[in-house]
């Protein structure tokens, strides 16, 4: 009687220790994922060999990869991602693992990023992104949108893509766009316009040319600026601009 009891105690303790070690390993993996991600986006890694070694050691997906960025609807709610980082990371990773997709998921104070391979078709990608958005909304109790990057041939391009994704969410906010998710390519025109608008000389020229229009619009409530904005958002298509203004 004593032997089976002792055996059960030892097995129970061993199981607890193994489970504890497993949990510690999972936590360390998450920390290492975050460290590597921020080393890449801050350009602390400059050699392809180092990027290849470190991503392989953490079992990140092989290149080429795609990055999906998730952002909460309003900046004032961005702190929720930090508060629920562990829950968010596990939930997004679980969605990808359920579809047998190798992944790395990193949550920052501003956004949640999912790195994955590019072998899946558009239909499955649509399902996965919508599942990610829905799960993020459930966890944070806040509306969410997503941007899907272009395929990256190597991890050293992560820094540039990260900046483009941040610009994409900034454009969505300032232009009051309503998409739930979008491909980064579709924001190329808006991103170019954003960069042009930051140029001091261009900014002064626009103020000089549009200054009188702004004054006239305010004085007579002609909604000329709203019409101009609709034209810009619809890539100068009068038909689409008219439809958006009518629906608005």
Kindly give the residue locations of the regions a language model identified.
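Interfacial "cap-and-anchor" motif at the non-cytosolic start of specific transmembrane alpha-helices
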Residues: 1-5
